[in-house]
């Protein structure tokens, strides 16, 4: 069963626990600038929305990487950056339409959400349940795929 992050912006309080948990899980420090998930605030509405890599089926970042440093983790479905292969060219950051791949100057490599190899720290840390790690079927992923197939067939 494939799982995915489900984000409910209505439950987000902008506490940044997700960012802190992510940076600690990946770097051993509480530093939101090192987080692979970000909480964006829409200033005109005051709404806060956590966002991170959506682990696209057709991952442009993976296809754009000239050294094939982004690979599919078949256990989690996550697209994972292989740090020992990444050359820091940033082509994947340009290819990602959502802006969820970030260049880390300290290490000269890119980073993106890897779902913490199946146990996302952000979901564990979220006190309000705004971020949950659930069966992908519950996120509507299958319905979106069915709709896409239907529209592709209609266009053909």
Each language-model region and where it sits:
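A positional/architectural concept
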Residues: 10-30, 35-42
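Flanking helices and flexible, charged tails adjoining ferredoxin-like Fe-S electron-transfer domains
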Residues: 2, 31-67, 72, 83-156
């Amino acid at each position: 069963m494939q799982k995915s992050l489900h984000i409910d912006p209505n439950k987000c309080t902008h506490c940044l626990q997700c960012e802190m948990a992510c940076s600690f899980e990946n770097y051993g420090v509480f530093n939101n600038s090192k987080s692979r998930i970000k909480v964006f605030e829409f200033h005109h509405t005051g709404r806060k929305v956590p966002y991170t890599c959506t682990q696209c089926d057709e991952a442009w970042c993976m296809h754009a990487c000239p050294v094939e440093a982004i690979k599919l983790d078949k256990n989690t479905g996550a697209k994972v950056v292989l740090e020992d292969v990444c050359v820091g060219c940033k082509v994947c950051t340009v290819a990602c339409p959502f802006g969820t791949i970030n260049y880390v100057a300290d290490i000269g490599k890119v980073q993106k959400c890897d779902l913490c190899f199946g146990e996302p720290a952000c979901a564990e840390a979220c006190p309000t349940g705004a971020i949950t790690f659930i069966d992908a079927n519950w996120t509507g992923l299958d319905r979106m795929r069915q709709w896409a197939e239907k529209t592709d067939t209609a266009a053909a």
